């Protein structure tokens, strides 16, 4: 795929240039953190590896760069090598470059940029370009009651570009616009013990892949004190995305979304974080399964694997008590440890006429968060649902 090769080469060039120390970067302090990796994921299983992290700090001991390359092993991916470079030029801006390649199927190349104070603080900008092959993806069929016995596997092979803008009309109110282009293909998966999705679910729409070109318009209300590590305030979002065949998409449909978040601090060390979201799709029955709404994974129902339940519409809600239990200087930075007991609820359904609350899946669990103000959050979330325990790791809060 020539386009894929061009993107990979561009990201490699950016990564190489990013590791060349500028005069400013050479003056930064460095802190080295050797970390063993023992990870578990409902879809990928157990992963073991070594993650040597290098922190680049300014004179105020604020992180400016993180170099986090690793080598890991998983029985699905084989040996998986990664290069990750994260940049934090200011409190309002951050960027990242990720290059990952396994010895088997999986690979991931991503370039991301975010600026919350663009054009004299009047515009928020987000951009993401990613090519990924994930051979551990699962599909159980459609519906809120899809059975574990219908589990199938496939490789998600997709290229996606996203640009998101928010123009501030007032300090707390913005108009938003998002444009995305996605090319998705379904290939044979990497889990030999599971049937291929095309064999287990032969009538599933989207097995032949699809091209999606979407234009989203919305309203944003935001009174949070911080977009990275919020402690108080609220967030409200209303969006409508048009995906027309006339713009090059494989079919025509419309997506609607609404989300509310609330953050309540008390007794200095505690923040009660709450979130509720509803998503609806208006369109034909042959909308590809990978474009329909789903619950499961680290951002929604943390006791189930990613995309465990799939259908046209969904409702999710979460609440967690972010509790700072420890704080000290570690590896040259002011680090905080948070414990966050949480509860997640969610349901998918086929029609807007259906109740989004009559058959909710519930998950309870505990999150471990490493917080380095003003921007960096790492998490390990362990959830218990009806199908057992699931664990997720990554960067940034789930909401």
Model-derived features with residue positions:
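Bacterial N-terminal signal peptides
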Residues: 9-19
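Residues that define the transmembrane beta-barrel architecture of outer-membrane proteins
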Residues: 30-32, 44-48, 77-81, 105-109, ...
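Membrane-embedded beta-strand positions of outer-membrane beta-barrel proteins
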Residues: 34-36, 67-71, 97-99, 125-129, ...
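Solvent-exposed, glycine/polar-rich loop segments of beta-barrel outer-membrane systems
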Residues: 192-203, 288-300, 347-365
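C-terminal outer-membrane beta-barrel translocator/porin domains of Gram-negative envelope proteins
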Residues: 199-208, 212-337
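C-terminal hydrophobic structural anchor segments
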Residues: 322-361
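Gram-negative/organellar outer-membrane beta-barrel architecture
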Residues: 27-34, 39-211, 377-378, 385-399
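Sec/Tat signal peptide C-region and signal peptidase I cleavage site
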Residues: 22-26
């Amino acid at each position: 795929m020539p386009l894929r090769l061009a993107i990979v080469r561009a990201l490699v060039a950016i990564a190489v240039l990013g590791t060349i120390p500028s005069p400013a970067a050479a003056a930064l302090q460095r802190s080295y953190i050797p970390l063993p990796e023992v990870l578990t994921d409902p879809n990928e299983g157990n992963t073991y590896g070594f993650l040597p992290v290098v922190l680049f700090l300014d004179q105020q001991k604020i992180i400016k760069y993180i170099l986090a390359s690793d080598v890991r092993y998983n029985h699905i991916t084989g040996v998986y090598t990664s290069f990750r470079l994260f940049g934090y030029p200011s409190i309002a801006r951050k960027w990242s470059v990720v290059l990952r390649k396994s010895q088997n199927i999986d690979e991931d190349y991503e370039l991301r940029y975010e600026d919350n104070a663009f054009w004299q603080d009047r515009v928020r900008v987000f951009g993401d370009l990613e090519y990924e092959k994930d051979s551990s993806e699962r599909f159980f069929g459609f519906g809120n009651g899809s059975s574990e016995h219908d589990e199938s596997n496939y490789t998600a092979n997709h290229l996606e570009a996203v640009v998101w803008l928010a123009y501030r009309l007032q300090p707390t109110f913005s108009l938003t616009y998002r444009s995305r282009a996605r090319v998705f293909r379904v290939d044979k998966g990497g889990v030999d013990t599971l049937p291929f999705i095309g064999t287990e679910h032969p009538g599933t729409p989207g097995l032949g892949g699809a091209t999606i070109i979407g234009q989203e318009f919305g309203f944003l209300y935001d009174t949070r004190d911080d977009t990275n590590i919020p402690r108080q305030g609220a967030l409200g979002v209303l969006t409508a995305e048009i995906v027309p065949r006339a713009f090059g998409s494989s079919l025509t449909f419309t997506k609607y979304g609404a989300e509310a978040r609330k953050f309540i601090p008390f007794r200095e060390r505690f923040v009660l974080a709450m979130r509720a979201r509803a998503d609806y799709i208006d369109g034909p029955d042959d909308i590809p399964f990978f474009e329909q709404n789903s619950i499961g994974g680290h951002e929604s129902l943390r006791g189930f694997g990613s995309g465990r339940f799939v259908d046209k519409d969904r409702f999710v809600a979460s609440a967690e008590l972010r509790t700072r239990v420890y704080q000290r200087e570690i590896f040259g930075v002011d680090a905080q440890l948070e414990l966050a007991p949480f509860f997640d609820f969610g349901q998918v359904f086929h029609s807007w006429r259906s109740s989004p609350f009559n058959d909710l899946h519930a998950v309870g669990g505990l999150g471990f968060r490493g917080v380095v103000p003003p921007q960096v959050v790492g998490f390990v979330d362990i959830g218990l649902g009806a199908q057992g325990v699931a664990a997720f790791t990554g960067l940034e809060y789930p909401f």
